[in-house]
Amino acid sequence: MRALLHVNGFTYGPLTPLLAYLMAFLGSVIGLQSASRARAAAGASRVRWLTMGSLALGGTAIWVMHFIAMLGFTVPGAEIRYDPVLTIASLVVAIAVTAVGLTLVVTRDGSTQALLLGGFITGTGVAGMHYLGMAALHMEPQKQYDLGTVAASEVIAVVGATAALWFAMRVRGLPAVIGAAIIMGAAITGMHYTGMEALHLSAATATDTTGWVAGMPTAAQNAPSGMSASELLTPLVVGISIATTVMLLIVAMAPTERELREEQRAIELATALRERTY
């Protein structure tokens, strides 16, 4: 016999959801600002801005948001540990799919086909990152997912990613970027908590002899493998948060999209004049 367990996603009250949303918002601001500069840049400069946008959206807005939210996830009586390989793999997936989506829409001038394809790839990848991150959780209770809620979370991820890429190609100016980032932050965190609603945990009842009693570890329980949140997540989250601060400073001090376009036009004009001279 197995019994469903109570899952607490808000162990620290509103603290972890608010911090998670803040990181989703900040990552979105940096990502949108980077995308606007990538639109105006060319060559190596465009690659650098696309890279920073991918790191900000995939690394900060999506991955850090997810694992800050997971710091508030507990199951009474169960020890939770994390697989370091799967956890880091989920970070790589988040950054990679964001890079694909941004590159598609920026290099193809935001065409409808590129937007839809990029949104599908990025959204599917973001949902995959979420469930890969959940697979990284090691605990004695058995994980099960409600397929209807999983599907809903994937739809939210694809729609949110498509909207994010649309914003990346359309918004100009800080007020518009902030407004778009508020919406994107809500979509990203909404997808996470919808995905968490799909999770159900079950454990052996007191009459079972499998070594784990619901809500109460027994002497026979095997400790799950992996690293604790303080050992793995905290250093990663802090490190990426510091990198986010650096990226925010870079964006604040960098030329605006308009200035980059004017600089590009000046270079093209100077090149044309030299060609005429010779």
Indicate where each model-derived feature is located.
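Peripheral, non-catalytic segments of secretory and membrane proteins
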Residues: 1-278
